[in-house]
């Protein structure tokens, strides 16, 4: 039996450092041999970092730094990106590897070949599900912020656009998550705090996604 909890702990501590080695090996400018989704993941990380930096500047009188916010992961218990994207070299329990070499057909443009392992397909699908959840949250939050009479801050289309581009490249069929809506007047202060929390979490996930793509590009 796979020790799920131990695996998750090891993955959380080791995955980013391990994948950062591959990042150092990858080429910055996309070429014909480059893993197709690496360019999208680089754009995603850049947009996430820029949007967070902009929010911290605009909301300078709000608790919006990493030290001030209550960190929250909206994907917790809903996706398994860290586990699914763990490199084979870090897995010691053979029973966890039974399905990793199974061929699987994907429809997305992230892979040069549509034929891949089951675990790689699971990794990419988990990334897709992460992006979908953040996309819905950002759109819902943006709808609230646009109702703010002060018009202090709202998300531009760049970050929403790069999320959509990577999702299209991954091209997994998935159930549509309905956008949350409310007729009640939102608490704009709390909404802006929530935006800071969401942007910090999203940037961390964008780092993970970019390093996964860098690893796959170097593999």
From Swiss-Prot:
Glycan-carrying positions: 24, 93, 107
Keyword Signal in record: yes
Example of a GO biological process term: interleukin-12-mediated signaling pathway
Keyword Disulfide bond in annotation: yes
A cellular-component GO term for this protein: interleukin-12 complex
Keywords: Cytokine, Disulfide bond, Glycoprotein, Growth factor, Secreted, Signal
Disulfide bonds: 37-110, 64-196, 85-123
Localization of this protein: Secreted
Signal peptide location: 1-22
MF terms (GO), sorted A to Z: cytokine activity; growth factor activity; interleukin-12 receptor binding
Pfam families hit by this protein: IL12
Family: Belongs to the IL-6 superfamily.
Subunit structure of this chain's protein: Heterodimer with IL12B; disulfide-linked. This heterodimer is known as interleukin IL-12. Heterodimer with EBI3/IL27B; not disulfide-linked. This heterodimer is known as interleukin IL-35. Interacts with NBR1; this interaction promotes IL-12 secretion.
Role noted for this protein: Heterodimerizes with IL12B to form the IL-12 cytokine or with EBI3/IL27B to form the IL-35 cytokine. IL-12 is primarily produced by professional antigen-presenting cells (APCs) such as B-cells and dendritic cells (DCs) as well as macrophages and granulocytes and regulates T-cell and natural killer-cell responses, induces the production of interferon-gamma (IFN-gamma), favors the differentiation of T-helper 1 (Th1) cells and is an important link between innate resistance and adaptive immunity.
Listed name of the protein: Interleukin-12 subunit alpha
Gene that this sequence comes from: IL12A
């Amino acid at each position: 039996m796979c020790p799920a909890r131990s695996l998750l702990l090891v993955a959380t501590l080791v995955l980013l450092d391990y994948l950062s080695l591959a990042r150092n090996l990858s080429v910055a400018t996309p070429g014909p041999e480059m893993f197709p989704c690496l360019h999208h993941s680089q754009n995603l990380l850049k947009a996430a970092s820029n949007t967070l930096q902009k929010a911290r500047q605009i909301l300078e009188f709000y608790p919006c730094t990493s030290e001030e916010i209550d960190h929250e992961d909206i994907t917790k218990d809903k996706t398994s990106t860290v586990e699914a994207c763990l490199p084979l070299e870090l897995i010691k329990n053979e029973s966890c590897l039974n399905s990793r070499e199974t061929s699987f057909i994907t429809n997305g443009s992230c892979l040069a070949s549509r034929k891949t392992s089951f675990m790689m397909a699971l990794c990419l699908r988990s990334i897709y599900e992460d992006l979908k959840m953040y996309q819905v949250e950002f759109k819902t939050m943006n709808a609230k912020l646009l109702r703010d009479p002060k018009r202090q801050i709202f998300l531009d289309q760049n970050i929403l656009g790069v999320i959509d581009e990577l999702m299209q490249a991954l091209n997994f069929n998935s159930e549509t998550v309905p956008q949350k809506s409310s007729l009640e007047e939102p608490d704009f202060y709390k909404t802006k705090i929530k935006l800071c929390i969401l942007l910090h979490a999203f940037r961390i996930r964008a780092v993970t996604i970019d390093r996964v793509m860098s690893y796959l590009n170097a593999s």
